[in-house]
Amino acid sequence: MTGEESGEVVEPRAADSPTAAGILLQFAAQAFCRVRDASFIHVNLDSVAHNIQVLKSLSGPNTGIMGVVKGGAYGSGMMKVVEVLVEEGVKELSVAKVGEAVYLRKRGINHPITVLGNLSTFELPDVMQYNLIPSLSWTTPLTSVPRDTLVYPDGSPLRVAINIDTGMSRYGVQPCDLRAMVHTLDDLGVSINSMYTHLQGSITEKKKNQKQIDIFLEATEPYKERPLTRHLAATTGCVQDLGTHLDFIRPGGAITGLSSGADRESAQQFANCGFRPAFSVVVRPTYFKLLPAGRFIGYDATYETRGDEWIANFTTGWSDGLSRRLSNGVGAVKRVKTGELCPIVGRVSMDSITVRLPEAPGEDDVFQVITDDFDDVTSAVGMARNLGAAVYEMPGNWSTRLARVYSRNGKIVHVCNALEYEC
């Protein structure tokens, strides 16, 4: 039950490991100086590398990884995450939009890139120029252009990924229409690079997903001898061990340690695989004061102090990506030094939050708005569960107004400054 449901604010909790806290405090002190701001996003690239190794252990010995890095690698910053994937031997990448793929090409990434969003004709010039692999649910975008335009600069034919609808009912050719689609592509001289589908069910719905896999395998069986690959296991499939024996797995959220499901059972199954969240939001108070009983705080006066209370201000709000629904005790921040959860009181406003502390904070006190763990309140999965939201929204909604600080082995290796478009 959340604070909103019970009418009570989140109360402090016991401390975590002092060793881990000490490391984070030391790291944060350096990071605050680098970003010159009282809040930043921390992306632990060691966790990304670790998660790739977990994914390798969950897939077959001859199965490759197609790393999905759409949406700025789910909020962590696409470029720095991709660099780790390349180091860890990931062979292919995928994104949602052509523009994301072009961004990677312009920064020297030469891996095969599949664009998962359904191709539109006006995207073809960029697809051809940058040697991308577009997804098709029908052949219309290709039949309306001259055949001689469907050739990459090196003279090789356009390669496409066929999306097959096995139950998601969004994009994808119907299995009964696949044969005709393949025939048309053959006539156009277009090469089929892969066939794939997307599972609809959550981590706890294995039977539903198995039905989709059966449909996919039956539909693609006639094309097994062609030089194409098949893939369907995104994060959910990897956790369920469904489709992990095919040519590729296609994880996205798992790369940065994000469960595809927010419910407790899904999150527990995901955590049991050994994944580590890489994303956190680190803050320190910019002002605090002791208020007497009977003071109303913030817009609309939604919180009244019950007695003498230490109230601290933090410069992060809904404009940065923190949900306004975490107002009035639904959400909390974690005090790193002690592990206490300190409730957000009053509204989450555009640029700040007010938090009730058990005492005046010290000069070296550091807090986390989103924690890189599976905490019931402050982690991405905990927040999503309490808000009835998707886990991927929690880091994915954070804007570029906060700097992103990247670490390896506890050391800062890169800072993507605030308001830079992408990292």
Question: Which residue ranges define each predicted feature?
Answer:
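Active-site anion/phosphate-binding pocket segments in diverse small-molecule metabolic enzymes
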Residues: 3-45, 49, 57, 100, ...
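Active-site-proximal beta-alpha core segment in soluble small-molecule metabolic enzymes
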Residues: 13, 23, 27, 33-35, ...
